[in-house]
Amino acid sequence: QNYLGFDNYVVLLGIVLVLSSVLCVVLGKVVDKRGRVRSSFPAVILMAIGMILMFFARSFIVTTISGVIMMTGYLISTSVLSSLVRDYTPKGKEGEIQGVRMIFQVMIPMIVGPFLGSFVIKGSSLTYTELGVVKSVPTPRVFLLSFLLTLLSLIPLVFLHRRERRS
């Protein structure tokens, strides 16, 4: 809103959410045919491509398309990876594994994310005032950092793919 100057970003957000949700339903059928493990890599790559496109997006239409790609990849990868966690959870250990999952999927990102985001955003010379507080305007560098961190998630997926091929 502040960086790109879109007055009505709600329309953009609505388009992105509706289109990516529809695409997820359609692509869910592909995931069902190919399997979750084989679909995990392309889903994460799709999300990463969307993030790098968001880094370069400056117009409403390019931002919308990039957002749809990023969000579709995010929704599919979240669905696929969450179901894989359930698939690989040993019987009787569901509570323990879900607790560990919550630590890595919720707690650590909630602690580390604001620090990383703040580090990237502080380099911005643009500011805005919200409720009397001057804040730095988030810049596209947030998406570049997200892209790089998303690539790290491919490392365990490589091992999962190897394991799947061996069995």
Please report, for each region that a protein language model flagged, where it lies by residue:
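Intracellular juxtamembrane helix-capping segments at the cytosolic ends
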Residues: 76-90
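A membrane-interface helix-boundary motif in multi-pass transporters
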Residues: 121-148
